[in-house]
């Protein structure tokens, strides 16, 4: 899933999608002990929503993402931050540059999650922490219904292609095993329940269309077909007040680079 796809509708992603994950961001930043002066690397930082929360805790934040359009918004949100275009598999930083690093819902999209995890471990100081998050199992996330609605509209992945599935690391122990493969020592793990809430069905549809998967569906099958599929899939989650509320569960794991 290319960076160009994630950059098609960056403002909708920034305003309609990222804020829904605030409780997850806050929980993990607390687990990392992010505070005054922490040198934090946010890998796959998107439009910088989590970076702002980290800065509010006193962190000196560097964000990396492959999508320039999202980084433009991150710079608007946090002028004091440093935001760099780059790939998770080849971080453009010296060894031991950061006190801690975090990858919110990012490693599953890496070309090689193991390589990306090792890169994250490389740039953290000995004794420093790395946290990663992802969806729990698909059946525990109501938003899976919307992801599945787009599957028939997207092109089939090339044989052997990987790194494009939202649930690639969702099985129990998946994150922990990945971080261990990078030579990190487990510290803690847990789950965070979230409600993805939108005032209207149209907002819920726009949030999904702003993702890389949404952009792929539009490119392959047209916006009208993608909107229709998502609108239908969202109906079970419409409240009497007309809002859309989807209950999801995310996993996180925290590990330490050995001293």
Name each model-derived stretch.
Residues 100-113, 136:
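A short SAM/SAH-binding and catalytic strip from SAM-dependent methyltransferases
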Residues 17, 21-25, 67, 113, ...:
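Conserved donor sugar-nucleotide recognition element shared by glycan-biosynthetic enzymes
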